[in-house]
């Protein structure tokens, strides 16, 4: 716990001054426990019943935060919120950060600062920082919706959405925007979305939901 607090404090200091200095770009993936590609009638029925948990993953292609280069490194945020994510929150969310195990201490602080700058208040209450191998592969399918994230106890795998097979009410759209700012992403089907670790209130396995985003990010 002491190590976690020290690293979080270092990241907070870095975040307050040079959170995205030099610019960072890379790949992004997200999955939630509710549909994000849906119609208003279905979204309204799920509000504050589901969608309180999410996994967000960033894999840096190239970038600098402060004096730390973080090329090729990744970080994942596991979030448990009080209300459906994307709606007004009545209490603070809890978050566990899974930091790339290859990063040195300066890079770890830089990755945490970067994630906090992207996810904002969702990462205001980080209850644990863990280290894991972070792999994010974005497949080259025509629609750009196929990706896979593996990071210790967190998993996401997506496929492209089909207007023919995945529509239910007929007026689906990206009802909830991505939880990370500065991303260019499209909604996708989460064929796997799970978290089996500790730190937040629940573990989950939420496959077969239109609740993912896959794309890229770039900050300046």
What are these regions (language model features)?
Residues 15-16, 53, 60, 130, ...:
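A sequence-level detector of short, solvent-exposed, charge-rich linear segments
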Residues 22-99:
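N-terminal Sec/ER secretory leader and immediately downstream segment
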Residues 8-16:
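Bacterial N-terminal signal peptides
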Residues 15-23:
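Bacterial Sec-dependent signal peptides at the C-terminal "C-region" and cleavage site
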Residues 98-217:
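Mature, soluble, non-transmembrane domains
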Residues 1-8:
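Bacterial N-terminal signal peptides that target proteins for export
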